[in-house]
Amino acid sequence: MASLKSIIRQGKQTRSDLKQLRNSGKVPAVVYGYGTKNTSVKVDEVEFIKVIREVGRNGVIDLGVGSKTIKVMVSDYQFDPLKNQITHIDFLAINMSEERTVEVQVQLVGEAVGAKEGGVVEQPLFNLEVTATPENIPETIEVDISELQVNDSLAVSDIKISGDFTIENNPEDSIVTVVPPTDEPSEEEVEAMEGESATEEPEVVGEDKEDDEEENKED
């Protein structure tokens, strides 16, 4: 479990104050949830990133708030891609004995046999809904695809659970499948198609109409 220090933000801050705060390398944040009142804090952005890399997106953090240490998870955060900067964080204070349902990333492991034969690995499901107490939430769920042939697939029910957690998704939901390769036309077929399109006479717009008008004049 990683630790992170925070500093309580006093009073109401203007947009200019928050901009100055972010420019100094700090991120405005709020702490709320189990056993605590809503508290506005700020944390060091670099230190926060280090902690998340250590514990993962759903990891538990010992957050120092004033004279207390609160066990929290990151409930939400906002990121500015233009400035490459985290702009706000929501820390949720948690009860370690209470189960929570969160999204956990699926990580494919190995290279499918079917992919080596030209098949294409498709992954329709990238995250799974997992219920567990905070310390039992996995960082990722690994799915071994090394034995998959072309037209093989794996569903949620095929996952071998190696921890104290429950997957909430429909057991029949497909996680990964190996589809047959798409047949691409050969060079000869491409040249033949191009030749056919070149020999087709373009339709002259209005030609039929002019012929009808000439026939009417003769009548």
UniProtKB/Swiss-Prot annotation:
Q: Where is this region: Disordered?
A: 176-219
> GO molecular-function annotation terms?
5S rRNA binding; structural constituent of ribosome
Q: Which GO terms describe its biological process?
A: translation
Sorted alphabetically, the keyword list is: Ribonucleoprotein, Ribosomal protein, RNA-binding, rRNA-binding
Q: Where is coiled-coil annotated?
A: none
- In the UniProt record, does the keyword rRNA-binding occur? yes
A GO cellular component annotation in the UniProt record: cytosolic large ribosomal subunit
CDD domains associated with the record:
Ribosomal_L25_TL5_CTC
Please give the superkingdom of this protein's source.
Bacteria
Record field: compositional bias (Acidic residues): 184-219
Subunit and partners: Part of the 50S ribosomal subunit; part of the 5S rRNA/L5/L18/L25 subcomplex. Contacts the 5S rRNA. Binds to the 5S rRNA independently of L5 and L18.
* Family label: Belongs to the bacterial ribosomal protein bL25 family. CTC subfamily.
**According to its UniProt entry, what is the function of this protein?**
This is one of the proteins that binds to the 5S RNA in the ribosome where it forms part of the central protuberance.
Q: What is this protein called?
A: Large ribosomal subunit protein bL25
Origin organism is: Staphylococcus epidermidis (strain ATCC 35984 / DSM 28319 / BCRC 17069 / CCUG 31568 / BM 3577 / RP62A)
Lineage of source species: Bacteria, Bacillati, Bacillota, Bacilli, Bacillales
Q: Please state the gene responsible for encoding this protein.
A: rplY
